[in-house]
Structures are given as C-alpha cells and as structure tokens.
Amino acid sequence: MATISAKLVKELREKTGAGMMDCKKALTETDGDIDKAIDYLREKGIAKAAKKADRIAAEGLVHVETKGNDAVIVEINSETDFVARNAGFQELVKEIANQVLDTKAETVEALMETTLPNGKSVDERIKEAISTIGEKLSVRRFAIRTKTDNDAFGAYLHMGGRIGVLTVVEGSTDEEAARDVAMHIAAINPKYVSSEQVSEEEINHEREVLKQQALNEGKPENIVEKMVEGRLRKYLQEICAVDQDFVKNPDVTVEAFLKTKGGKLVDFVRYEVGEGMEKREENFADEVKGQMK
C-alpha cells in the first residue's frame, strides 16, 4: 500500500475542496492515485469535479497585445505581487508581448534567443530586469492567434492582469462583443469552446462517474441512465463556453449573444497567473496536528 503523505492529502483538498479525513480515506482506497481519488470522492458525492489547473501560487502578470490580424497572450512570472505591480515590470511584459508578435517565435526557448530593436536578446533583457528589480523573473508561456479582416479579437484583463483572456470571434468585427465574451470566460473558466472539442474518452469517463454517483445515491437502476444523461448535459454546459448562460445577460447563452452580432466563438485562450504551479507551504502541518488532538 502506498504511503499517503500530508502533501498528497493537501493537494487533493485543494483540487476538490473535500475535508482532510475524506481526502485521506480516498487516497488510501485508491492506493495514492490522486486522479482515482478525485473520482472516488465524486462518486461518494463528497466533491465536485476538480477544476483544471486550480493550484494558484506564483506571482506575475498576464498581458494581451494585438496588431492587426495577429494577437498574443503572454504570462511572465515574478516572485512577489509587489513586483507585479511595478511599472518597470509591466513595461517589460508589454515589450515581450510585442516581441512575440514581431518575431512569431514558436517556443519560449526560441523567443529568448530573438533580438530586440536595441540589439539585445530577450534573454539579456530579462537578466537586465532581474538585476534592476531584484527578483527572479521568467517568461512562462504565450499563445499567438490570427484572424481575418472579417473577424474580431476580444482582449480582457482581470485584476490588473491576474487573469487574461484572448478570444477569436468569426464572422463579426464587433470587438466589444468579443471582449464581453472574454470577460465571461475570465469569470466562468470554461475548458472548451463547444462540446465538439470534448473527447469521447472524457465523456465516457464522466458518464461512468455520474452513473456510480447515482447508484450510490440509491437511485433505481431503471432511471439511472436517464439521470446520467441529464447530468452529463449539465456537465458539458459547465465546461463549454458557447452553451453557458452569458454573464452579462443570463437569459441567453454565449452562442446566442454572439449570433445577434453575426459572430461565432471559434477559439479562446485563458491564462491565470501561476495556475498549475506549486503552492507555498502555509500552516498545513499545524492543521494536521490539530486534527490529531
């Protein structure tokens, strides 16, 4: 049997919101497999589906820059929130975003080797900023998107760049509508544009979890299938942007809202600073000790 560490229990708690003892039991029952433990908790009705990359720790900024039919969303990390609010750091983030658009670099590694207008490489510029600011800084990721003259980009930054979203709306040049949808995505955090992007494997997995959940609730087998399909539709609505109730007008879906503008959401990228990165250890040992008293 696998040893269940306090760190593993903590990770499961952060992903599911379930209690410490429930998480420990789930990990014990699944031999320390965190993905199976999440399913175990959900089947028992203890936890909801874990959100994608919901462990937020690192500081920094997300920025969106557009130039004609090209746009980029970039995340650059710092060690503290104080530096993220620094005007010099904010200028650096914009400078790097523009460099991505100018060079069309495909990877962070390739970007670091490109030359800025002043003759220095991006790598040298970052090191220079580290020396000036006094903190470790790093370009974490970026994504470039393109459109035609008949389409629109939507750019939205939340909390000064803590969350950033870039949307691509096809068939409409209404940038305000595209931005409104970007705001919706920042708030609701869907995983996909539409259900067409959800893999059959994920749907089958979710269907099985929902089936076990219904059976564990004591529902008769003859109605379980109907219940599962209903809950599956709700699940898809929760993770697919176009099927969600639009945050600025819950009477219509995102798809219906854009249809009134003659447009259709075809792509989006949502970055949240530090998502998926390790959290700092904060009093978890004290919490464990408290449970043992």
Curated annotation (Swiss-Prot):
Q: Where in the cell is it found?
A: Cytoplasm
Q: Where is this region: Involved in Mg(2+) ion dislocation from EF-Tu?
A: 80-83
Q: Which UniProt keywords apply?
A: Cytoplasm, Elongation factor, Protein biosynthesis
> Per its UniProt record, what Pfam families does this chain match?
EF_TS
What molecular function does GO assign, one term?
Answer: translation elongation factor activity
Q: Name one GO cellular component term.
A: cytoplasm
Primary site of residence: cytoplasm
Highest taxon of the lineage:
Bacteria
SUPFAM superfamilies attached to this UniProt entry: Elongation factor Ts (EF-Ts), dimerisation domain (SSF54713), UBA-like (SSF46934)
Which protein family is it in? Belongs to the EF-Ts family.
Biological role:
Associates with the EF-Tu.GDP complex and induces the exchange of GDP to GTP. It remains bound to the aminoacyl-tRNA.EF-Tu.GTP complex up to the GTP hydrolysis stage on the ribosome.
Task: State what protein this is by name.
Answer: Elongation factor Ts
Please tell me the species this chain comes from. Answer: Staphylococcus aureus (strain Newman)
> Which gene name belongs to this protein?
tsf
